[in-house]
């Protein structure tokens, strides 16, 4: 209703001004500005909806002010371009319509009415309400109800008798199990759901709407609100260190806690969270690749669900045979947005909706089959009688190819329980949320019936029942929850540990690299993650007088303030103000100690603008002074005009990537010498090893042969045509996720380049 009202007010404002107001520059500018704000707000809302499926929420607040990288980002480029073009088109059309009757006499009354209608359209829009609530959540000091409802459970379970298997289904919300809406989509897992305790109204709250946030909510009974973006949690050394979570209680009660997933454990700090809260046995992509049958059978995120659940079954069987008390948590990935992935062992590889195949529905149908197969193995085993199986979604599905169909339904998270000791078949329609999951499980295992803000749905009352406005209530508690991190409020002295790649100050530890905004009463950490912008881009958003401490590889800050370190991959510390003075210090000891020293200098806006512009230079446009192309740092030598077909820098160098160009091309600003030696230090990937690799300059071609290990080869070239471009053509680029950023599409690797040097051989 609010959305319809806002649109009606918007159209009324346009019509009144266009047909009645007449000509006046000030009123035209004011009305166009407010109407333009309405357009921007709503396009922002729909763009956010595209990524999250939930409009402008806490999860996208960080992303809206930083670059989006990571999971399948290429699939969002086209929609992003469409949004920008639509915005330009709407503004142009709006200005043209408002000026239609500019030659008519001005009428103050109608101009005022049009402006008031425009302001009303903004105020009534859902986008404005969402942003207003988010801003309030950032500025509140907390909510007195937090102290009333936040409860710390006992740290152990007396006489535990049941093992626990907890399955997180990636985005596998309960809505998919509506057989009337989606016939025969989830028959295997749906049948198991109907055999157990099925909680049909599990809502999603702010701060619980992405994977690591859903895990924190379900185990600690709190949303993931932090002084940084939640998916950047990999940079912290401990995770809600003061909280007692489900894993802590299980460990104290004698459980061995296991976690198995197909993706890298470091992503979003899952390893930090789990290690901080009772899990000693963690298995992700790195740990599984040495034990799975086919290490190359992977999707963009890691190992497929059938592989992961097979490994989970092996763990369950071995642990059950050992007789020790255990919990086994596992997380699937095949249903990850935007499209999902199909395991090769599935019988259900295709699901049609609206008379055409739908990839997301197909991935759901396949994944639920794999989960059901895993559960049925447990049920058929002699150990089921001592086991509780929990199946839940980590969060509601984000914007995938099934999302518009899901939105037509009443959406809820999945949460059901199968008890081997005491079979119960019941659908419970009690209002609840994912923070109640851990407390419900703890209650069944014989512990307390509360964890944090979560309550057992079997014997307690959820916040979703207590508060009609539970989403607003949780947002109001955000400052209270952030305080649970116990983050430092000042930074004076700090220590960098090069062996551990950590920085420590005021009792806190963070992984490197790290950017910090330091004020009198607050230290704001800005880690680098798969979803955040590089730290230099984040620093470019600082105000001229903001104090910063930036710890990163030297070459990343060298182009600004230390050109002599342009090729150094050591750690450096920079501090200062973008509009004032900055220093760069080379970290030259294993345990390097430093102090903050911010000078109260006059702000130079010209210097500030220059620093910001330099920070925003993209990697491929960076240039440094060197007599060779060094591939483990960003950019290229000053002599290089442009290059293509080359992937990002890694610690050792860079791969060629046929996704970025069929050949490696390096174009120099000036013609290459008439006669020169080309010294190439490189290695080959996969089948490119020990095969002839053509290297061309102008009309002349030489052959390069590389092995799997790095070697140096010198090729001799004549260049009578004054060619300026070097071309290397790997013969068989291999599609692989080797060394890939989690969630990115596979690269097509050919050769790995460490250094290329042109040596003039003219006499």
From Swiss-Prot:
Identify the pathway. Answer: Glycan metabolism; osmoregulated periplasmic glucan (OPG) biosynthesis
What EC number(s) is this enzyme filed under?
A: 2.7.8.20
Intracellular or extracellular location(s): Cell inner membrane
Q: Which GO terms describe its cellular component?
A: plasma membrane
Identify the PANTHER family for this entry.
LIPOTEICHOIC ACID SYNTHASE, PHOSPHOGLYCEROL TRANSFERASE I
Q: What does this protein do?
A: Transfers a phosphoglycerol residue from phosphatidylglycerol to the membrane-bound nascent glucan backbones.
Q: HAMAP family per the record?
A: MdoB_OpgB (MF_01070)
Q: What is this protein called?
A: Phosphoglycerol transferase I
Quote the gene name from the UniProt entry. Answer: mdoB
């Amino acid at each position: 209703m609010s959305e319809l009202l806002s649109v009606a007010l918007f159209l009324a404002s346009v019509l009144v001004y266009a047909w009645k107001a007449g000509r006046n520059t000030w009123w035209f500018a004011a009305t166009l500005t407010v109407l333009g704000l309405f357009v921007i707000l709503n396009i922002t809302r729909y763009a956010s909806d595209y990524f999250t499926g939930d409009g402008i929420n806490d999860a996208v607040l960080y992303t809206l002010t930083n670059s989006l990288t990571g999971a399948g980002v290429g699939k969002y480029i086209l929609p992003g371009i469409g949004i920008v073009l639509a915005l330009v088109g709407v503004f142009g059309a709006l200005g043209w319509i408002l000026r239609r009757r500019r030659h008519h006499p001005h009428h103050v009354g109608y101009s005022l009415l049009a402006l008031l209608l425009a302001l009303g359209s903004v105020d009534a829009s859902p986008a404005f309400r969402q942003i207003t609530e988010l801003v309030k959540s950032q500025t509140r000091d907390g909510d007195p109800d937090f102290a009333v409802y936040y409860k710390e459970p006992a740290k152990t379970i007396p006489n535990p008798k049941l093992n626990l298997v907890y399955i997180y289904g990636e985005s596998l919300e309960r809505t998919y199990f509506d057989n009337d809406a989606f016939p025969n989509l989830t028959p295997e897992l749906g049948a198991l759901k109907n055999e157990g305790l099925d909680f049909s109204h599990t809502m999603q709250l702010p701060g619980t709407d992405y994977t690591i946030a859903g895990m924190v909510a379900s185990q600690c009974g709190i949303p993931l609100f932090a002084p940084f973006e939640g998916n950047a949690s990999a940079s912290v050394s401990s995770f809600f260190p003061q909280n007692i979570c489900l894993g802590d209680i299980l460990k104290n009660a004698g459980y061995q806690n296991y976690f198995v997933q197909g993706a890298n454990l470091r992503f979003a700090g899952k390893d930090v969270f789990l290690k901080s809260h009772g899990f000693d046995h963690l298995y992700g992509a790195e740990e599984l690749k040495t034990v799975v049958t086919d290490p190359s059978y992977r999707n963009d995120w890691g190992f497929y669900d059938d592989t992961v659940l097979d490994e989970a079954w092996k763990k369950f069987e071995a642990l059950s045979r050992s007789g020790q008390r255990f919990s086994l948590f596992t997380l699937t990935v095949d249903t990850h947005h935007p499209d999902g992935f199909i395991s090769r062992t599935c019988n259900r590889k295709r699901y049609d909706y609206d008379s055409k195949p739908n990839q997301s529905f197909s991935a759901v149908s396949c994944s639920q089959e794999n989960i059901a197969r895993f559960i049925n193995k447990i049920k058929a085993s002699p150990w089921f009688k001592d086991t509780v199986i929990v199946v839940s979604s980590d969060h509601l599905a984000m914007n995938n190819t099934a999302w518009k169909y899901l939105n037509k339904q009443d959406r809820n998270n999945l949460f059901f329980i199968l008890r081997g000791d005491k079979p119960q078949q019941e659908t419970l329609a009690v209002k609840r949320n994912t923070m109640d999951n851990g407390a419900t499980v703890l209650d069944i295992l014989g512990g307390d019936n509360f964890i944090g803000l979560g309550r057992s749905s079997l014997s307690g009352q959820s916040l979703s029942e207590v508060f009609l406005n539970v989403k607003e209530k949780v947002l109001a508690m955000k400052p209270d929850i952030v305080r649970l991190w116990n983050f430092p409020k000042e930074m004076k002295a700090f220590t960098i540990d090069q062996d551990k790649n950590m920085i420590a100050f005021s009792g806190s530890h963070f992984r490197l690299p790290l950017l910090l905004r330091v004020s009198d009463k607050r230290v704001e950490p800005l880690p680098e993650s798969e979803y955040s912008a590089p730290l230099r881009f984040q620093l470019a958003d600082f105000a001229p007088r903001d104090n910063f401490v930036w710890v990163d590889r030297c070459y990343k800050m060298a182009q600004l303030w230390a050109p002599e370190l342009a090729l150094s991959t050591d750690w450096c510390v920079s501090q200062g103000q973008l509009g004032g003075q900055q220093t760069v210090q080379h970290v030259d000891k294993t345990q390097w100690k430093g102090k903050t020293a911010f000078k109260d200098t006059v702000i130079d806006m010209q210097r500030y603008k220059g620093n910001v512009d330099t920070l925003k230079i993209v990697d491929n446009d960076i240039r440094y002074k060197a007599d060779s192309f060094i591939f483990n740092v960003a950019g290229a030598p000053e002599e290089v005009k442009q290059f293509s077909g080359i992937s990002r820098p890694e610690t050792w160098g860079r791969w060629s990537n046929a996704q970025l160009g069929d050949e490696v091309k390096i174009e120099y600003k000036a013609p290459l010498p008439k006669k020169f030696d080309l010294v190439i230090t490189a290695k080959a990937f996969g089948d490119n090893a020990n095969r002839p690799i053509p290297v061309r300059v102008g009309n002349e071609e030489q052959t390069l042969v590389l092995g799997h290990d790095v070697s140096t080869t010198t090729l001799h070239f004549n260049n009578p045509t004054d060619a300026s471009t070097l071309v290397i053509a790997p013969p068989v680029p291999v599609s692989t996720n080797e060394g890939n950023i989690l969630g990115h599409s596979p690269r097509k690797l050919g050769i790995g380049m460490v250094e290329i040097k042109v040596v003039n051989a003219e006499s």
